[in-house]
Amino acid sequence: MQAAGQSGAGRQRTRVRSAPPRRPMQWPWPRGLARPNATGVFLTLALLLGGAGINYPLIQLAIVVAAVVALWRAPGAPGVVWAQGGAARAVLVLFAAWAGLMAVQLVPLPPGLWRALPGRDNAAAVWDAAGLTGWHPASLTPDLTLAGLLALVPPFAAFVLVAAMPRRTRRGALRVLVVVALIGTVLGVLQIAGGADAPLYPFITANRGIGTGLFVDRNHQAALLLIALIAAQVPGVVGAWHTTEGKSRRHIRIVALAVSAVLAIGVVATLSRTGLGLLPLALLAGMAAAAVVSTGTGERRLTMAGLALLAGLCLVLVLSPTGQEAMQRFSGVGDEGRRLYWANTLDAIRAAWPLGTGFGSFVPVYMGLEPMSQLGPEYVNHAHQDFLEIVLEGGVVAVLIAAAAVATVAAAGWGAWRRGEAAVALAASGGLLVLAGFSLVEYPLRMTALGVAAAVLVALLVPAPEAAAPAGRPRRIGLLVVLALSALSQIGLSLVLAGAPSAASRVAPWLSVAWRNRAEAELAAGDTTGAVADAGLALRILPIDATAARVRALALIARGDMAGGARLMGADAALGWRDPPAQLWMAQAALLGGRADLALPHIDALLRQNVGEAALVQELRGLVPAPAGEAAIVDALTRHPGWRQEFLNGLAEDAAAEPDDVAHLLADMARAGVPAQPGETALIRWRLADAGLWGPVAQVWRASGGRNLLGDGDFAGLNGPLPAYAGPYVWRAPPLPGVSVTAGADTGAGGGRRLHVVSDGLGQGMALAQTVVLAPGRYRLGVALAPGAAGAAGAWGWACHGTGTVQPIDIAWRGDGRNGAGTLAVPAGCPAVEIGLLIDSDPAHRGWAPLAKITLDAE
């Protein structure tokens, strides 16, 4: 016994612990549920193509088909998840509640009820003006609400299919997410490297030149990459964590850190401000997910060191030119625009509280209250604050469901932590926080890919079923109904986008856009009867469709029903400023009636949307001579329209023929508190000078805020090379061979703007000049050189405009040699004076002292 014991002890001392045998990774699956390939294909397709947006309905249909196929092959999946109880069952209840709210919004209501709902005044007014009566759902946009209901299918399928997976196989869903994110990262880096013209954008996007990857929007790409960055740190997502030990685990950890580093580069490539702002959160969540499962001091040190290096890499990327370009956008106008959207959305919420306006109704509802001052070429497609948009469209019930969802997810996360799934709990919670952060300024969950990603993260938090869980009872009839409705809707939308509204209205007769576009085509073809009928069908579905109301009104007018058409046009005006043909019609009708004051708001709306600028500016110019027209224009200018400079430039063409009218308009602008600035009237002064009207030149100069005898004496309005030709009160650099004049900031301690004159020593003459209007008399010209300036000071001279005879101005310099002054005497009969810097052809004078300020005062 002793020998045997010693022999056994010896064997124990020399025994080498062997690693468990490597086996191919298996994906056990409960009986009756989908095989993993169906689920994997669906998740991959949804994440790869789900960033396409609403302009690709057939892609959305493909994703829905994949979801239905996966659910078809897993008829018992919902039952398996329901059987888990707790958080899993609560999430299913929340899905049902959200879908139920949408379904209730689609239930037709009697006229007295739906018209009495808050926020339905415009809809009721349009129906009254159009002569329409009958029942209507609570949603103002029932076709879009139905689309939102069908859009729940992919997230629901993702949640059910992943939640029904056994615990050890769930990480496969995260692995799909990380792989797709890496593909998007590589594509995004290639996109930003290739520039705006690179043929690497899979979808039409306004973010060309930026790394949008597999999305149409930079922020949505950044959101997916941040989620994947966190997920990559979960053990088992990158490499077979549970089947390896020691050195192999360290190798896997290094690969996971490298994957996260690549994803961080992709985030920077998006130039997303929100993405960069949430990058630290993603790093912390990934660090926590990796740290909670690290065993041994060496492994923990490797994890912390790697994540510290990753944080350093992110800092370097942020400080790179690409990162700085994104950071500069933090001080841009985007935040100001969003704040305006939020304020307007809050107004809409108050008007429709507590029931909301219906899911999908944001755009037409927002257009109905969008202020004139905020109009622009691009319309507002979302509130850019998803929580506000949910409140607007779903009302108080949506708020309660959303609050319950937050509480359920928080409880599920805590439950996952207590079950020993700390890494998954931290990663999933971190990913959901990233989406919540983006939802504060964007609408990520309205993109199919991110909705599916969110559903996967929630599914990872609920308890996993046992492998032998019952399959449940198939419910395939519902899947067929969903598939049929989705197919008809998406095919109908694709036909609309293809310019076939008649076919679309037959395939999906519940689509208002199909009937509206069909009515527009009929009106253009002269079929007024068909246009009236089909526009009416569009309004029956979507009563606040401004385009459909306008088409029906114009068709009525074309049929001789002037009163009915005008009445409907009046109701259409309350639906906003966004329908250009309606605005043009109302402007023309007001002008024909001699009501310039009524026409100007509609002209203003068109110009703000860059519609018909040249013709409308010409129309405005024709209104200036009439007192009522001028008053209406001044009133429009008080709203600071973007077309103001274009109008003043157009007015320059009339300045020579109607100088008094122009001067009177400028004076009225000043009295109204929106005075023209000197730079805005530069072209007017130039045209007056070309006509020899020097008195009006001075009058316009004073009316536009010109307080000095000389324009821009401190060069504050100048930057870069000066123009060779310019009008009065504007500095110019007359063309001289080998001479350049450039304005720029002073890099020295003095600050301010500086004017630099450089010569090759051969050119001579007036290198810098300005034309001004001066009354006869004596004037004092002051010249200040830049502090510490080196080089020749140059000579100054003046000449009566048109004479060509330059008379010198004797500049007396003070002791410091930087400040000097001289006098000039303007005789009678000199309508305008040219004052300028004279240089000689001395080769020794190549660098002239930079100018800091020029002044001109009467003695």
Q: Residue spans of the language-model regions?
A:
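Alpha-helical transmembrane segments of multi-pass inner-membrane proteins
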Residues: 2-4, 13-16, 23-48, 62-70, ...
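Alpha-solenoid helical repeat scaffolds
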Residues: 516-517, 547-551, 580-586, 601, ...
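Extracellular and organelle-lumenal recognition/adhesion modules and their flexible linkers in secreted
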Residues: 11, 188, 611, 634, ...
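TM-adjacent membrane-interface loops and short helices in multi-pass inner/ER membrane proteins
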Residues: 105, 217, 339-380, 387, ...
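Hydrophobic alpha-helical transmembrane segments in integral membrane proteins
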Residues: 320-334, 475-513
